[in-house]
C-alpha cells in the first residue's frame, strides 16, 4: 500500500479519443504542463473509441436523417445538421494540423473518403428527402449533394441494395462524395503515441477508484495499480473525466453540485458484419435509412463500408440491446450503483416516461438471427444468413436529467460537458455524435475550465483550427479553402464539394 501523494498539473481519466484530443490540445497550448493519464484497460482506445465499438462515421449530417426534422408546415429544420457539420469541420482541421506538423503520420490509417448517402422508401419519405435535399443544398457546407428517385440512377449508386428488389414502392436517395469513414481507435492510438513523445505519463491497467477535493483546492485521485496491486494517490489542479460510460460514476464521486440530479441509461449496440468479401466489394458508401415510427434516434439503420486494419469491411445495424453495464468491460452493478438519493426521482421519472424505449429494447433483445436478417434484407434483398455474423459494439450511456423543456427525468441524446463552477474538474457524458465532434467538445472544456487563458491561447488555437469562433456557413469562401486544404493534407481526394 502506498499513500504517497504525487502532484501533477493535469490528470486525464480514460485513454479514449476525448482524453487523447484534450491532451493533444493542451500539449500544444501549454507544453510545460505535466499531464498524467490513467486507463483501466491494457492499452489506449479499447472501449467506446475502438473501431469495432462505434460506427466509424465522420458525423457531419450529410446522411443522418435524424439531424433534420420536419416542421408542422412541411418545411425542414436544418439547424442541427449545420451545427454538427460545423463541429466536424473543427475536428478535420485539427487532424490536418497534426498531420501537417508531422505530429501524427499516415492519415489514411485513420480517415478515408467515402460517399455518404441517405435512402428512403415510400411516397411520404421520398417527399421528405427531396425537401431535405433542397433545404441543405442552399447551405455551402452541403453543396455537391445529389438527389435521385430514378431507379436507373439508384442502381448505379447502390448496386447491392437495388439488386433483387421486387417492390414497386417509390425510393429515393441523396449522395455526397465528401463523407468520411473514421477509425477512431487508430486515431486514438496515434494521438497517445504522440503524447508519449511529449513526456505525458501514460498509466495503463490503472483503475481510478475515487476522486475527492483536498483542503488546498486540488483534486486527489485514488488509483489502483492493477499490475502491482498497490494503491496510489495523485493530486492535480485540473482533472478531466473522459471514461465513456464510466464517467458518470466517477463524476458522482466528486460531490460537485453540478453532478447532482443526473442519471445514466445504458444501451448496448450490435452490428451485423459481412464475412463474404465478394459481397463487401459490391458496396462503397455509408447508407443511412430512416428510423421506424416510434423508434428512438439511436435506432437509425445504416449499411456501412468500413476500413478496419487496412481492410474493407461491411457492417449493418445498429441493433440495440440492454445491459446494466456502463462500459463493455464494466460491472452488472453499474446501473444500480449509479442511483443516488439526489437522482433517484429523476431516474424513476425517466422510467415512467421512456416506456416506449424500454419496450423497444426488450423487442431488440428478443430478435433472433433470422429476424435481424429480415431487417437487413430491407437494405439488401438478396442477403444470405450464412454471410453475416453478429459483432457486439460498445456501451453507450444516455444522460438522464431534469430539463425546463422536457421536465423531470428527460433522456438526452447528445454529448454534454459537466464542469465544476471553478473549472477545476470536468466530465464528458452522453453518446452521439461523440467522437466526430471531439475537438469541438474539448474546446468547450477549455472554454469552461480555463476562461482566463483563452485570450492568450486564441492565436495558437486559430493556427491549429482556423475556423475556431467563425461560422463557415456564413463564410463559404473560407469553407472552400479549408475543405480543399484539409482534404489534401488528409488524403481525401473526393470531388470538389463547393461550386461557385
Curated annotation (Swiss-Prot):
Protein name: Probable malate:quinone oxidoreductase
Family matches, as InterPro entries: FAD/NAD-bd_sf (IPR036188), MQO (IPR006231)
Family that this chain belongs to: Belongs to the MQO family.
Cofactor entry: FAD
SUPFAM superfamilies to which the protein is assigned, alphabetical: FAD/NAD(P)-binding domain (SSF51905)
Molecular function (Gene Ontology), one example: L-malate dehydrogenase (quinone) activity
Species in which this protein is naturally found: Bacillus cereus (strain ZK / E33L)
UniProt-listed Pfam families: Mqo
UniProt-listed Enzyme Commission number(s): 1.1.5.4
Keywords: FAD, Flavoprotein, Oxidoreductase, Tricarboxylic acid cycle
Gene Ontology biological-process annotations: tricarboxylic acid cycle
Recorded name of the encoding gene: mqo
Catalytic activity: (S)-malate + a quinone = a quinol + oxaloacetate
Pathway assignment: Carbohydrate metabolism; tricarboxylic acid cycle; oxaloacetate from (S)-malate (quinone route): step 1/1
NCBIfam families assigned to the protein according to its UniProt record, in alphabetical order: mal_quin_oxido, PRK05257.1-1, PRK05257.1-3, PRK05257.1-4, PRK05257.2-1, PRK05257.2-4, PRK05257.3-1, PRK05257.3-2
Keyword Translocase: no
Amino acid at each position: 500500500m502506498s499513500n504517497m501523494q504525487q502532484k501533477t498539473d493535469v490528470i486525464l481519466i480514460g485513454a479514449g479519443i476525448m482524453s487523447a484530443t484534450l491532451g493533444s490540445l493542451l500539449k500544444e497550448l501549454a507544453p510545460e504542463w505535466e499531464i498524467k493519464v490513467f486507463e483501466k484497460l491494457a492499452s489506449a482506445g479499447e472501449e467506446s473509441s475502438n473501431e469495432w465499438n462505434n460506427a466509424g462515421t465522420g458525423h457531419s449530417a450529410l446522411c443522418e436523417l435524424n439531424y433534420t426534422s420536419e416542421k408542422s408546415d412541411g418545411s425542414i429544420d436544418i439547424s442541427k445538421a449545420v451545427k454538427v457539420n460545423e463541429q466536424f469541420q473543427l475536428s478535420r482541421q485539427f487532424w490536418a494540423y497534426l498531420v501537417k506538423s508531422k505530429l501524427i503520420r499516415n492519415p489514411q490509417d485513420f480517415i478515408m473518403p467515402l460517399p455518404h448517402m441517405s435512402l428512403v422508401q415510400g411516397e411520404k419519405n421520398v417527399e421528405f428527402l427531396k425537401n431535405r435535399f433542397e433545404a441543405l443544398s442552399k447551405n455551402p457546407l452541403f453543396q455537391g449533394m445529389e438527389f435521385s428517385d430514378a431507379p436507373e440512377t439508384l442502381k448505379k449508386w447502390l448496386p447491392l441494395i437495388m439488386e433483387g428488389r421486387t417492390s414497386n414502392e417509390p425510393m429515393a436517395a441523396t449522395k455526397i462524395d465528401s463523407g468520411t469513414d473514421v477509425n477512431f481507435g487508430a486515431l486514438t492510438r496515434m494521438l497517445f503515441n504522440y503524447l508519449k513523445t511529449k513526456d505525458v505519463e501514460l498509466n495503463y491497467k490503472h483503475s481510478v477508484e475515487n476522486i475527492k477535493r483536498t483542503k488546498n483546492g486540488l483534486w486527489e485521485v485514488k488509483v489502483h495499480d492493477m499490475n502491482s496491486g498497490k494503491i496510489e494517490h495523485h493530486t492535480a489542479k485540473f482533472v478531466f473525466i473522459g471514461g465513456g460510460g464510466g464517467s458518470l460514476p466517477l463524476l458522482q464521486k466528486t460531490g460537485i453540485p453540478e453532478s447532482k440530479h443526473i442519471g445514466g441509461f445504458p444501451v448496448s449496440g450490435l452490428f451485423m458484419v459481412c464475412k463474404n468479401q465478394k459481397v463487401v466489394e459490391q458496396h462503397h458508401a455509408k447508407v443511412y435509412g430512416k428510423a421506424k415510427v416510434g423508434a428512438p434516434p439511436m435506432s437509425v439503420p445504416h449499411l456501412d463500408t468500413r476500413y478496419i486494419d487496412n481492410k474493407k469491411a461491411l457492417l449493418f445495424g445498429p441493433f440495440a440491446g440492454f445491459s446494466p453495464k456502463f462500459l463493455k468491460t464494466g460491472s452488472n452493478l453499474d446501473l444500480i450503483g449509479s442511483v443516488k438519493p439526489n437522482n433517484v426521482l429523476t431516474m424513476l421519472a425517466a422510467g415512467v416516461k421512456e416506456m416506449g424505449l424500454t419496450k423497444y429494447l426488450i423487442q431488440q433483445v428478443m430478435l433472433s438471427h433470422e429476424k435481424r436478417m429480415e431487417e437487413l434484407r430491407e437494405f439488401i434483398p438478396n442477403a444470405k444468413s450464412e454471410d453475416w455474423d453478429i459483432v457486439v459494439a460498445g456501451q453507450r450511456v444516455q444522460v438522464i436529467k431534469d430539463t425546463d423543456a422536457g421536465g423531470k427525468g428527460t433522456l438526452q441524446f447528445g454529448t454534454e460537458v459537466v464542469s465544476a463552477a471553478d473549472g477545476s474538474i470536468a466530465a464528458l457524458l452522453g453518446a452521439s455524435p461523440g467522437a466526430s465532434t471531439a475537438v469541438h467538445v474539448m474546446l468547450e472544456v477549455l472554454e469552461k475550465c480555463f476562461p482566463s487563458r483563452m485570450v492568450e491561447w486564441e492565436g495558437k488555437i486559430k493556427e491549429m483550427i482556423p475556423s475556431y469562433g467563425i461560422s463557415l456557413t456564413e463564410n463559404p469562401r473560407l469553407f472552400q479553402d479549408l475543405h480543399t486544404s484539409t482534404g489534401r493534407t488528409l488524403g481525401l481526394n473526393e470531388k470538389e464539394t463547393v461550386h461557385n
